[in-house]
Amino acid sequence: MRHYEIVILVHPDQSSQVPAMVERYQSMIKEKDGKVHRLEDWGRRQLAYSIDKVHKAHYLLMNIESDQGVISELENAFRYNDAVIRSLILKRDHAITKSSLIMQGAEKGKSSSKKVAAEAEASEEA
């Protein structure tokens, strides 16, 4: 079994369907004895350039371990799903389980905003 990194861009109008899509893709992987090592939902983000007159997309990142048959099935599922506007599948040497830089930045942003809010409350009380 090989390790893969998959990035999927979903049409922003279909963002509500993302959890069902993720569940479907995970079940496709697990049916064939594959493993999902990392799954990150980056949310809706601005695209660098418009794709089919769409300027934003819902981003998903998956790191999986599976065989080539599952990857072929996933490619077909992405190709024939109108909600998926782009997908990228990369072969990796090993499983990547730690948070991506985008998620680490989001977590730091949340913690720093909490610190700012706590400092503001402390200064108001003083």
Swiss-Prot record:
Gene name of this polypeptide: rpsF
GO MF assignments: small ribosomal subunit rRNA binding; structural constituent of ribosome
Segments of this protein annotated with the region Disordered: 104-126
Family: Belongs to the bacterial ribosomal protein bS6 family.
Function: Binds together with bS18 to 16S ribosomal RNA.
Species in which this protein is naturally found: Coxiella burnetii (strain Dugway 5J108-111)
GO CC annotation terms, alphabetical: cytosolic small ribosomal subunit
Keywords carried by this UniProt record: Ribonucleoprotein, Ribosomal protein, RNA-binding, rRNA-binding
InterPro entries: Ribosomal_bS6, Ribosomal_bS6_sf, Ribosomal_S6_plastid/chlpt, Transl_elong_EF1B/ribsomal_bS6
Annotated protein name in UniProt: Small ribosomal subunit protein bS6
GO BP term (any one): translation
